[in-house]
A protein has these predicted regions:
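Short alpha-helix boundary/capping and kink motifs at helix termini
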Residues: 2-63, 69, 75, 79-80, ...
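Short, charged/polar micro-motifs that form catalytic or ligand-binding hotspots
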Residues: 59-64, 200-204
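Short active-site-adjacent helix-start/loop capping segments
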Residues: 64-66, 74, 92-96
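Helix N-cap/beta->alpha junction signal
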Residues: 66-67, 207
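Alpha-helix N-cap/helix-start and coil->helix boundary motif
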Residues: 70-71, 211
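Solvent-exposed functional surfaces
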Residues: 86-290
Length: 290
């Protein structure tokens, strides 16, 4: 991968990561970007003049596993390099979950017909309150949770990648056309929402993407929808605070300055639970650079 030989290795609990910078042109995103998220991040990054956190990349395939929007914003800012944490994606300790869309509605029946209109072209199924099956479908399959008089889970069992992408984008387009508030939550948070039976909350998500489906994007060039995967690593790196000006320099100069910055910093382990950017992290450790 690339010509950069300078790498800062860290071993956390027998899970090895390598910290370095790589050429942006050598990396492969596996997801599309959300323009709203990118616009907000772009403004903040330009104002600060630095990238806070490195992205995470599979060292075998050069596929970006975490940090698609940071990658996209550095491209927009004409940077040549990006700070990365290299990992071995074959490790069983790296897990893949999915992000789920949480939609706030005054009256879910207003978009119910639109949702069924989208699904009628496919061999969908419906579940009503069969808890164990319900949770399995939320985690594994493409689904929509409708909290109507009789709550319903509409789902498509193991759709192919193209069908999955079409449906996720179609559902998102309904939400955006109605100008409804939407946020992203985890699988565990989604199950808690279903248990609450809040009649003003709709949930939907695509199928859970597998590791081979993530890597295959490099060959197929068809990206998964934005926020499709939620990767969970044993450890993540925070606050490298890399100046953007370094990432625009010629290769040798950029690499040397980047590693000079790392050598001057101290790193410390944050054991879960810990707080980062107003989020309580419970699933992995953090390495904080100061």
């Amino acid at each position: 991968m690339g010509s950069n030989k300078l790498q800062y290795k860290i071993n956390y609990n027998d899970f090895e990561i390598e910290l370095t910078i790589l050429k942006i042109e050598e990396l492969y995103p596996h997801e599309e970007i959300d323009e709203k998220i990118l616009k907000k991040m772009l403004k903040e990054t330009e104002e600060k003049g630095m990238l806070y956190h490195p992205i995470i990349v599979d060292k075998n395939s050069s596929v970006i596993l975490d940090g698609t929007h940071r990658f996209a914003l550095l491209k927009k800012l004409n940077c040549k390099f990006i700070p990365v944490v290299l990992v071995d994606y074959n490790s069983k300790r790296i897990q893949v979950e999915k992000w789920i869309r949480k939609v706030y509605l005054q009256n879910p029946t207003t978009i119910k017909n639109k949702i069924f209109e989208i699904f009628k072209r496919y061999n969908y199924k419906i579940l009503q309150d069969e808890k164990s099956s319900l949770y399995d479908r939320i985690i594994q399959d493409l689904f929509v949770w409708l909290p109507l008089e009789q709550p319903k889970l509409i789902y498509l069992e193991n759709p192919d990648i193209d069908t999955n992408s079409i449906l996720v984008k179609s559902l998102e387009s309904i939400v955006r056309s109605e100008e409804i508030k939407m946020e992203f939550i985890t699988e565990k948070e989604a199950i808690k929402e279903v248990e609450k039976r809040n009649k003003n909350i709709i949930l939907f998500g695509g199928k859970r993407i597998t590791k081979p489906e993530v890597i295959k994007v490099r060959e197929l060039k068809n990206l998964h929808p934005a926020k499709s995967t939620r990767h969970i690593f044993p450890v993540k790196v925070f606050y490298l605070n890399t100046p953007l000006e370094i990432l625009k320099l010629p290769e040798n100069e950029a690499v040397n300055k980047f590693h000079s910055i790392i050598k001057k910093k101290r790193s410390k382990i944050l054991f879960p639970p810990f707080k980062i950017e107003n989020t309580i992290v419970t699933e992995y450790a953090g390495i904080l650079f100061e």
